[in-house]
Amino acid sequence: MTNNERIPSHVAIILDGNGRWAKQRGKTRSFGHKAGFDKVKDIASYASLRGIKALSLYCFSTENWNRPNQEVNFLMSIPIKFKEESKIYKEKNIKVIVSGRKDRIPKNTLDAMNDLVDDTKESTGMILNICFDYGSLNDLMNTINNLVENGTKLDEEKAIYSHLSTNPVGPVDLLIRTGGEKRLSNFLLIEAAYAELYFIDKYWPDFNNEDLDNAILEYSKRDRRYGGIKDE
């Protein structure tokens, strides 16, 4: 950490590479997802310590349903394990919210997520936004449909943020993708309209505190102009 560092308020991470990480070790993809799950609490805790206000994690996309049933079933069990760690998040004053569809998720999975949200609702520190069965285009479609149905007309562009499922966290400042790929994959497309993008080859289970520090340092060096120009 340097004196000139600017800490991004909202950091979003695409948790990519669990399966490839496991394959390198001769393990199943579920083994990789378990390792990725274990990494979440560590990075969330450190992000909170660094002063980040909101951390959004892409845990399960609307497209991930196309994966093999065995893998999907395992991914559906992960939020149940999140519930078991609610004490950790409460101790660190981290508030957990969930963004994404709720209608396709198994009841025991949804109950576990709702319990975790309820257990941490009094926390006043960093918001940990678990994006589960989330897709930005789907979220935008639902938002537009709701606005039309309610006869709501937006007076300015920024007003759209308050109607998205990610409303509590708002625009993204820094978006990180692990695993070497360089695309957004339908993640927070509106919220990340002016985000700084940071790609790292490391797979998510290997991502550590130093990697987050490096991403923040790189963010601090970026000149965010939002389409304007700097004063001469």
Which functions belong to the PLM regions below?
Residues 1-232:
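Flexible, compositionally biased loop and terminal segments
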